[in-house]
UniProtKB/Swiss-Prot annotation:
The keyword Kinase does not apply. This is Rho GTPase-activating protein 2. InterPro entries: CRIB_dom, CRIB_dom_sf, Rho_GTPase_activation_prot, RhoGAP_dom, RopGAP1-5. The record marks R165 as: Arginine finger.
Amino acid sequence: MTGLVMMTKGGGCGGGGKGGRRKSTAEEEEEEEQNQQQLSLVEFLLTALRKSVVSCRVDNRQDDGGVGGGISSAVHHMEIGWPTNVRHITHVTFDRFHGFLGLPHELQVEIPCRVPSASVSVFGVSAESMQCSYDEKGNSVPTILLLMQERLYSQQGLKAEGIFRINPENSQEEHVRDQLNRGIVPENIDVHCLAGLIKAWFRELPSGVLDGLSPEEVLNCNTEDESVELIKQLKPTESALLNWAVDLMADVVEEEESNKMNARNIAMVFAPNMTQMTDPLTALMHAVQVMNLLKTLITKTLAEREENATGSEGYSPSHSSNSQTDSDSDNAQDMEVSCESQATDSECGEEEEVEEVEQHQEHLSRHSTHEDETDIGSLCSIEKCFLNQLNNNAARVSNTSISEDWSPKAFPLVSFTENKSNTLSSSTSD
């Protein structure tokens, strides 16, 4: 068999020329597509760059023509402005008892449960660190005191004989202490235990209620007005605690017929709990003056209550007319008696003056002797009360026996009383 073969100048077969041209055309198309893609990408980048430059350009053709105007225009076109308009709206703090302080009204959150104290115990801590409430007189005192007072009144504790004087059992007191530390006042508690814990709360304060007053100031306080001016020197917390305690003692005195506790007795048992001194003898002497101060304040409170009760009574016209008639008849009788006695007064005037002088001297001597005997009795009573408290504190710490350093033998009880008695006898003999 024979066939025809065509040869070209470029070499190769003539039948493959058409396929070569197709291949070169496809490559050209691919290159054009790549070039177009690159151009489109470059155009996109240029467009984005142009927009960013236009948004941040500075217009130097403004009226002011300054640099400040250009900067303000650039800042105006920026999406995020400079923090130039800043205001301090509120300052919020957190307190354990009151929650968040300083929050707006719509964001305030009430804490449902409040602990009675910031510490583990409600005894031996300052009143500032405890949750406080207001009593009927407006005194801000720890809530635990108000709870104990309410329970004492509800159980008729003020009518118990020897209230605040009879010491409770230590085992029962420790159990009630644990309950009070959790803000719970047990039911059916012994009123003497409750009264003893009220005294213990004042006694175990970091600083006494009356420690802000010097012993010299308390010693020089003799009248009711001086006592009122003296307690004004106390801080608000101590002043509120003292007013609350005085009102409590006044309530006790009002039930004197049942509890056998007068103003002097209740002041005597509270006095050693109001001050704290390192020297026991100095504390004992200072307690006597504190007792007199408390007694004066109690008497003043009772007098004010009596005046308020008397002033609240209604006005009765019939009673006033009867009293006026009685007073007129009494005045007439007095006039008759005075007229009859004018003749005899001139004769025995000198004798009566002599008798009055003698009676006055005798009364002064008896009064001074009675005051000295009263001072001795109050001093002895406070000594016993003070020593009993020291013994109770030592027994609570050791739980076994009373320490020898705090025993009654460490204090010259007999010698001090004997010196006072000798002074009394010498003054009487003179």
